[in-house]
Swiss-Prot record:
GO cellular component, as recorded: chromatin; intracellular membrane-bounded organelle; nucleoplasm; nucleus
Extent of motif OAR: 274-287
MF annotations from Gene Ontology: DNA-binding transcription activator activity, RNA polymerase II-specific; DNA-binding transcription factor activity, RNA polymerase II-specific; sequence-specific DNA binding; sequence-specific double-stranded DNA binding
Highest taxon above the source species: Eukaryota
Protein name: Short stature homeobox protein
Gene: SHOX
Free-text tissue specificity from the UniProt record: SHOXA is expressed in skeletal muscle, placenta, pancreas, heart and bone marrow fibroblast and SHOXB is highly expressed in bone marrow fibroblast followed by kidney and skeletal muscle. SHOXB is not expressed in brain, kidney, liver and lung. Highly expressed in osteogenic cells.
Misc note: The gene coding for this protein is located in the pseudoautosomal region 1 (PAR1) of X and Y chromosomes.
Cited Pfam families: Homeodomain, OAR
Lineage, broadest ranks: Eukaryota, Metazoa, Chordata, Craniata, Vertebrata
Illness association: Leri-Weill dyschondrosteosis: Dominantly inherited skeletal dysplasia characterized by moderate short stature predominantly because of short mesomelic limb segments. It is often associated with the Madelung deformity of the wrist, comprising bowing of the radius and dorsal dislocation of the distal ulna.
Keywords annotated in UniProt: Activator, Developmental protein, Disease variant, DNA-binding, Dwarfism, Homeobox, Nucleus, Transcription, Transcription regulation
Sequence motif SH3-binding, location on chain: 242-249
Length: 292
């Protein structure tokens, strides 16, 4: 429509100028230019562009130059069509994005479901654990027949039983390594999980007040018998920190027992010597009192 308006206005202005120029010359024939001729040429042009005849009819009835406001309706219609088209495209894009989000969400849910299935754990009852521990005490590596029999008796699958024994052996190896490194694992509860020679179950640790009491006893013995001080100093660690009844290697227990025996023998011999010295001192005092 804008092209049609520009063409009509341009044609009318050009023909008007040509007519005025010819009249001014005086010699030439004056061409009669009418507005209808311009409109007819514009009509032909509009048919080529596909414009409706109603718009040209409005221009013919209005007269004068081609008013632009007559084409406002067509421009508004075009804008509405463009707006509807754009809205449809936006809606289509939103729908596609929504579908993609739903697909991604469904994939994430599937992945989470797979992870949850992999992390499924079996909660054993106390009876099942007792049976498993009893068989583990007998052998750490049960064969397929033993696992199958145990699984049927406990109502578990053979795979679950096999996995339990694998985890149990791993736990036992870990405890063995810690015991070899001298790491004290726990308190009064025994490590009945692992039964490996030459190690035995570990007992409770000595309390701090017991250590203080042992130190006081050591100081009292050293003060009463000064001649035993070197022996007590040599074996002070064994007296201050007596070995627990359980939890140390047999070699360490034997060494501490031999050290205690040496200290006891030294104390016994020294006590005999001290008693003889006391008797001699008393006899000397008695002789002096009698004036002998």
């Amino acid at each position: 429509m804008e092209e049609l308006t520009a063409f009509v206005s341009k044609s009318f202005d050009q023909k008007s100028k040509d007519g005025n120029g010819g009249g001014g010359g005086g010699g030439g024939k004056k061409d009669s230019i009418t507005y209808r001729e311009v409109l007819e040429s514009g009509l032909a042009r509009s048919r080529e562009l596909g414009t409706s005849d109603s718009s040209l009819q409005d221009i013919t009835e209005g007269g004068g130059h081609c008013p632009v406001h007559l084409f406002k309706d067509h421009v508004d219609n075009d804008k509405e069509k463009l707006k509807e088209f754009g809205t449809a495209r936006v809606a289509e894009g939103i729908y596609e994005c929504k579908e993609k989000r739903e697909d991604v969400k469904s994939e994430d849910e599937d992945g989470q479901t797979k992870l949850k299935q992999r992390r499924s754990r079996t909660n054993f009852t106390l009876e099942q654990l007792n049976e498993l521990e009893r068989l583990f005490d007998e052998t750490h590596y049960p064969d397929a027949f033993m696992r199958e029999e145990l699984s049927q008796r406990l109502g578990l699958s053979e795979a679950r039983v096999q996995v339990w024994f694998q985890n149990r052996r791993a736990k036992c190896r870990k405890q063995e390594n810690q015991m070899h490194k001298g790491v004290i694992l726990g308190t009064a509860n025994h490590l009945d999980a692992c039964r490996v020679a030459p190690y035995v179950n570990m007992g409770a640790l000595r309390m701090p007040f017991q250590q203080v009491q042992a130190q006081l006893q050591l100081e009292g013995v050293a003060h009463a018998h000064p001649h035993l001080h070197p022996h007590l100093a040599a074996h002070a660690p064994y007296l201050m920190f007596p070995p627990p009844p359980f939890g140390l290697p047999i070699a360490s227990l034997a060494e501490s027992a031999s050290a205690a025996a040496v200290v006891a023998a030294a104390a016994k011999s020294n006590s005999k010597n001290s008693s003889i010295a006391d008797l001699r001192l008393k006899a000397r005092k008695h002789a002096e009192a009698l004036g002998l």
